[in-house]
Amino acid sequence: MLSILDIIEDTTVDGPGFRTSIYAAGCPNRCPGCHNPESWDINRGRWMSTDEILAKVLADNFADVTFSGGDPMYQPEGFTELARAIKRQSRKKVARTSGAIQDILLRLCYVTHYRPNYCSMSMYW
């Protein structure tokens, strides 16, 4: 189960092309200037199963996926499971933004691209 603030379909602001953006609840980083401070509290989200989220992602044949938030890696097992399920069942590209520690991410994920940024990291599965 993952705590999710929102799922936005067919957005063009969270990565290249059309995306399904999944906004995670919960973030320990408290970055200065955060554009989603309401996402810091994990209890503000709605608990959703990986299968429930996966169905929404796979329903759009054209959009790739962005994990945002909050910090998706505040819930590393769930988002890693979701990323792997998306890759197993589709050709979608999955991007993620996070301020989480790099070596944790590299151990958990099949990373094909890594681009660090101040208090934010983008990673593609």
Can you annotate each of these PLM segments?
Residues 3-30:
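N-terminal pre-triad scaffold of radical SAM enzymes
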Residues 97, 104-125:
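Radical SAM/AdoMet-radical enzyme domain recognition
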Residues 30, 61-62, 113:
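Short loop/turn motifs at secondary-structure junctions
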Residues 2-5, 18, 36-95, 99-108:
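Conserved Radical SAM active-site core
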Residues 10, 14, 71, 121-123:
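Acidic side chains
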